[in-house]
């Protein structure tokens, strides 16, 4: 299925869908450090463009004739870091994403965002726009730790189809989830050579020491050393003297990027693009679930549905 990735970042969603057999024909982003990294790892083009420029975006995307548009509009205005403020401007990119999709009219669309985005007026408005123009929608919240990622990271996915109802797709996704969360030790074995690690908390009211025998907390866009004055939290998994911060590469591996994936830019830029990315295995889970759904006899009988796989 010819696919274009909008707000592609360094390519987590692209890579997961490629690994599942989708043809990524192009990607679009507006942050040069992420674009530089994307270009190091993929042979198809990534275009530098502000997707708020809807007319320019539509003209560009039409040249690639995508059958599927995937993308995660920036989510800072929906995130749990502080109060939500949908008036900050970046949340409006969710509406821009929907407008672009409606102008292109691909057979399929997948929109990713943070878990709480589904409660926002802008997210609901974007879904209404798609539904009003004939897209059947399925919405699901997926925990990455149940999708082959050693990380507690919940994300909202909206899947839209222009050629018939997909009301039962969310059930297919739920049925394919693992029965228990993947831990850091499950994924790395003993290769980290530590039982505990430090993840800098948003506030010191939260714990910062985690065990490899549990999933990682959500990988964020910052990675800081252990403060010399750090005070133990009652819920810390172990003593701070037994812990160390994860390296940039280790954080990318928790995001399930392959070992040979090349990140470029300053350390802070790399940390940010890693934290912003959709985990590769989460994207792969979503893509293979869509394949499984399309391969059901009922879906194959739809005369309007091309055979992509």
From Swiss-Prot:
Pfam entry (one): DNA_methylase
Family in the record: Belongs to the class I-like SAM-binding methyltransferase superfamily. C5-methyltransferase family.
Keywords: DNA-binding, Methyltransferase, Restriction system, S-adenosyl-L-methionine, Transferase
UniProt GO BP: DNA restriction-modification system; methylation; negative regulation of gene expression via chromosomal CpG island methylation
Native source species: Herpetosiphon aurantiacus
UniProt protein name: Type II methyltransferase M.HgiDI
Domain of life: Bacteria
NCBIfam families: dcm
Residue intervals of the SAM-dependent MTase C5-type domain: 1-297
Keyword Ribosomal protein in record: no
Catalysed reaction, written as an equation: a 2'-deoxycytidine in DNA + S-adenosyl-L-methionine = a 5-methyl-2'-deoxycytidine in DNA + S-adenosyl-L-homocysteine + H(+)
Gene: hgiDIM
Entry function: A methylase that recognizes the double-stranded sequence 5'-GRCGYC-3', methylates C-? on both strands, and protects the DNA from cleavage by the HgiDI endonuclease.
